[in-house]
């Protein structure tokens, strides 16, 4: 799934400022370590355009792929708690594969609202493969997570699963969203273990929410006809079902807002991008 522009009625600056969200709406928090979660947010908003959205990203501890599970759990709990103290949340989507693999139990134990996680789309990839070789492209944290191994054992016993962990690819996705160029040679170096195989994967699981941002660039490097699968659409459907199943949900008449953990030159440059996705303002979240 490549990042596609939303309808003009949603993304244009005029729409953001002139259609000040006046109808009360349930509040959904989308959280990621960086901007990759925008790929999941986009899928959710296409299904649920009338929610009140908060996008929070941890640009202080980014990237999460090399952090310990204990650190990630404590960090995510701290950030979600800080947002919840400022906004009545109806649902939280942890739009980060690495954080999802370790933090969901702790979040669900602490909070009463639904918490949705993102897991690698191994099951649908197994259905799509033609040569029986599926590649999982993720952060090293996700590749080595016990949850990922459980998914492979449950759904991929009849396939060969090739694992490739890369934090560099996360950085390249952030570079692209900030307006930078993604060098093809850098992608070739990252993907070399697969490109050098006699029979490389014909179906790739994009196991990090940053990676759909690079679908076009990856397609130029991977063998022709390689399919790329992510879990964004499935997460959107799950979110829609959970929202529709709730009763007496507290709603908000506030504008959409984005939170970061530190304001700097990078976040100044990112603000126009966030505005294009429907977040008129970006603030530092006190934690």
From Swiss-Prot:
Single GO MF descriptor: glutamate racemase activity
EC numbers: 5.1.1.3
InterPro entries documented for this protein: Asp/Glu/hydantoin_racemase, Asp/Glu_race, Asp/Glu_racemase_AS_1, Asp/Glu_racemase_AS_2, Glu_race
Keyword flag Membrane: no
Pfam families for the chain: Asp_Glu_race
Enzyme class, UniProt record, top EC level: isomerase
Location of the active site: 96 (proton donor/acceptor), 208 (proton donor/acceptor)
Residues that, per the record, bind substrate: 32-33, 64-65, 97-98, 209-210
Pathway as given in its UniProt record: Cell wall biogenesis; peptidoglycan biosynthesis
Domain of life: Bacteria
UniProt catalytic activity: L-glutamate = D-glutamate
Keywords of this entry: Cell shape, Cell wall biogenesis/degradation, Isomerase, Peptidoglycan synthesis
Listed transmembrane segments: none
Record bears the keyword Aminoacyl-tRNA synthetase: no
Biological process according to GO: cell wall organization; peptidoglycan biosynthetic process; regulation of cell shape
Family: Belongs to the aspartate/glutamate racemases family.
Task of the protein: Provides the (R)-glutamate required for cell wall biosynthesis.
Stated name of the protein: Glutamate racemase
Organism: Yersinia enterocolitica serotype O:8 / biotype 1B (strain NCTC 13174 / 8081)
Lineage of source species: Bacteria, Pseudomonadati, Pseudomonadota, Gammaproteobacteria, Enterobacterales
């Amino acid at each position: 799934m490549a990042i596609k522009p939303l309808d003009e009625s949603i993304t244009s600056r005029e729409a953001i400022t002139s259609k000040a969200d006046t109808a009360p709406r349930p509040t959904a928090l989308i959280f990621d370590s960086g901007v990759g979660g925008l790929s999941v947010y986009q899928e959710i908003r296409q299904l649920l355009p009338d929610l009140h959205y908060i996008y929070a990203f941890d640009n202080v501890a980014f990237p999460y792929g090399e952090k310990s599970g204990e650190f990630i759990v404590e960090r995510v709990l701290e950030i979600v708690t800080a947002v919840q103290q400022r906004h009545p949340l109806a649902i939280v989507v942890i739009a980060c594969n690495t954080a999802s693999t370790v933090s969901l139990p702790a979040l669900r134990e602490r909070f009463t609202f639904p918490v949705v996680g993102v897991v690698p789309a191994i099951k649908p990839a197994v259905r799509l493969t033609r040569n029986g070789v599926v590649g999982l492209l993720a952060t090293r944290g996700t590749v080595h997570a016990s949850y990922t191994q459980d998914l492979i054992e449950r759904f991929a016993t009849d396939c060969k699963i090739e694992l490739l962990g890369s934090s560099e690819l996360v950085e390249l996705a952030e570079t692209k969203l900030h307006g930078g160029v993604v060098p093809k040679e850098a992608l070739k170096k990252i993907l070399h273990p697969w490109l050098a195989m006699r029979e490389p994967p014909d179906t790739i699981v994009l196991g990090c929410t940053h990676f759909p941002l690079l679908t076009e660039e990856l397609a130029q490097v991977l063998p022709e006809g390689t399919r790329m699968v992510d879990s964004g659409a499935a997460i959107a459907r799950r979110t829609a079902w959970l929202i529709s199943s709730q009763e007496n949900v507290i709603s908000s008449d506030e504008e959409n807002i984005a939170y970061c953990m530190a304001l700097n030159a990078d976040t100044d440059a990112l603000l126009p991008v966030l505005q294009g996705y429907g977040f008129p303002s970006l603030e530092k979240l006190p934690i």
